[in-house]
UniProtKB/Swiss-Prot annotation:
Name this polypeptide is given: tRNA1(Val) (adenine(37)-N6)-methyltransferase
Species this protein is from: Shigella dysenteriae serotype 1 (strain Sd197)
Entry keyword annotation includes tRNA processing: yes
Gene Ontology molecular function: nucleic acid binding; tRNA (adenine-N6)-methyltransferase activity
UniProt entry keywords in alphabetical sequence: Cytoplasm, Methyltransferase, S-adenosyl-L-methionine, Transferase, tRNA processing
Catalytic activity of the protein: adenosine(37) in tRNA1(Val) + S-adenosyl-L-methionine = N(6)-methyladenosine(37) in tRNA1(Val) + S-adenosyl-L-homocysteine + H(+)
TM annotation in the entry: none
Top-rank taxon, per record: Bacteria
Known EC number: 2.1.1.223
Amino acid sequence: MSQSTSVLRRNGFTFKQFFVAHDRCAMKVGTDGILLGAWAPVAGVKRCLDIGAGSGLLALMLAQRTDDSVMIDAVELESEAAAQAQENINQSPWAERINVHTADIQQWITQQTVRFDLIISNPPYYQQGVECSTPQREQARYTTTLDHPSLLACAAECITEEGFFCVVLPEQIGNGFTELALSMGWHLRLRTDVAENEARLPHRVLLAFSPKAGECFSDRLIIRGSDQNYSEAYTALTQAFYLFM
C-alpha cells in the first residue's frame, strides 16, 4: 500500500511505520499515549510489558524503538480491544515480537515466571462518576476494574530490580499517584511535566518509577510554541512516529 493511500485510512491513526485501527477500542489514539510511548526509557531493555494495551499503540511504539531481540507482552482485559490490538500488530513489522494476552492483569501476573525491564501503562484515572456510553469505555476511563494501588502492586510483582514502570496521568492525579507509589516502596526516577504552551500550567505528567533508589531527573515539555507549531522538544521526541513531522 502506498503512503498516499495509507494516509487516507479511516477508523485509526497512521504513523510513519505502522497503522493503529481503534474503532473497536473504547479509548482512541491520543497525545497521552503517543507521549508515553515516545518518552519511556528503553536503553538496555530485553522484555517489556504493556498493561491495559487497548489498541496496541504503546506496544507498537516500543517495538519500533527497541532492538529486534526485545520481546513485548501486551495485556488487555476487554476482548474487542485485544482482538483489534492483535490485528494491528499482525499488520505491523513486529508481529513476531509482540504477544497479546486477553486477560485480567492481576490474574495474568500470577502465572508469569519472567520479569520485565520496562513496564508501561496509560492507566484509567477517573473515579466512578458520570455514566459512560458503553461498559467498555467505562472500563477504560475509570479505576473500578484496576485501581492505582492494584496497578502498582502488579508492576512490583514482575519488574526487574533496575527496571522502570512508566505511566502518563493528569498533573494532579499524577502527584497523588507518586505519593502512593512512594508509600509502596517505589522510587521516582524520571518526571516530565507537560504543558500545551509556555503560558499554560502543566496538564499531564510522565512518570518513571523503579524498585531501585537513585537520583530523580525532572524536566518540562512544552508541546506548542508561540506560533502554535510543535516545539523543537516535542518534535524531537515524537518525529520518529508522526507521519508529517
